[in-house]
Amino acid sequence: MMTMLRGWITMLVMLTAINAQAACSWPAWEQFKKDYISQQGRVIDPGDARKITTSEGQSYAMFFALAANDRPAFAQLFNWTQNNLAQGSLREYLPAWLWGQKDPDTWSVLDSNSASDGDIWMAWSLLEAGRLWKETRYTEVGTALLKRIAREEVLNVPGLGSMLLPGKIGFAEANSWRFNPSYLPPQLAQYFSRFGAPWSTLRETNLRLLLETAPKGFSPDWVRYESKQGWQLKAEKTLISSYDAIRVYLWAGMMHDGDPQKARLLARFKPMATLTMKNGVPPEKVDVVSGNAQGTGPVGFSAALLPFLQNRDAQAVQRQRVADHFPGSDAYYNYVLTLFGQGWDQHRFRFTVKGELLPDWGQECVSSR
């Protein structure tokens, strides 16, 4: 009788554990996999007629898989990326940034140039997957990829120092360089500083990029730096804060409170928080020079600002907007912004002061709060 009782108790404990695991899965991530990721591990953006895949999309999905402790999905994403974007080896090649339907009968790389934002997230995710899952292969590939990024996408800019170019081709001229402030999240820059040069100095030059190019508190999507003249912040149509720059506020908000850079960044970008609180929604576009805003940002912008907003009432307004207008199966970019922002808001992951991932694998699931 006691043996049977122990057996029933064991089964009950197992069923409880299984149910708890099911209840604590990440529903938004599971839905993203169904809507956007092929069985082979390709993240598809259905908004483009060519059904494109980007290195950015692959790298973001690798991060989400790691945060969700989804090892099978991570492996599929990694293998597809390596085989199709990196000529079979992420140790030897930076991934091409764009892949899709070239013509009715051909699916292939559409642009072989690299995109350093995807490369950065991919290297970090591989290194952290190696650490958290104790997978030596991921550590080795992540280390090799990071070295390749340093060789092919990092440049010494007179007057600035080591800077991360947006890609290996097309962003550096004789006396002019083009940068994207959203491409190197500060917490990832902090993480990479353990690898020495050039990463140990990139963290500080990246901070300069973020602080010095936002005169009114709004980060630009893109900005030029010219030798002897500095940042080109004269009013022009292209100097706006919009779909790229929304990630600057997202990354800053997700930084560990103990990182001294966080307070400086939140203070510099406070006008974005103030404007969002005033209007009830984030702006779609802001003129970086004048601070004039226009349009209503999509729901992904609201999700991206959940970690960034420091006022609880302001957070609640954006949280409700995300809940009421959750991205569907045809909104890739809004969906990834939501996985980042809402995922952080739901405590599914955090970053340590060293820039390491602190996942929520072993803790009880919580709702947004």
From Swiss-Prot:
It is found in: Secreted. Residues 1-22 form the signal peptide. Keywords: Carbohydrate metabolism, Cellulose degradation, Glycosidase, Hydrolase, Polysaccharide degradation, Secreted, Signal. InterPro entries: 6-hairpin_glycosidase_sf, 6hp_glycosidase-like_sf, Glyco_hydro_8, Glyco_hydro_8_CS. Its main location: secreted. Pathway: Glycan metabolism; bacterial cellulose biosynthesis. The keyword Ion transport does not apply. NCBIfam families: PRK11097.1 (NF008305). This is Endoglucanase. It comes from Salmonella typhimurium (strain LT2 / SGSC1412 / ATCC 700720). The lineage of its organism: Bacteria, Pseudomonadati, Pseudomonadota, Gammaproteobacteria, Enterobacterales.
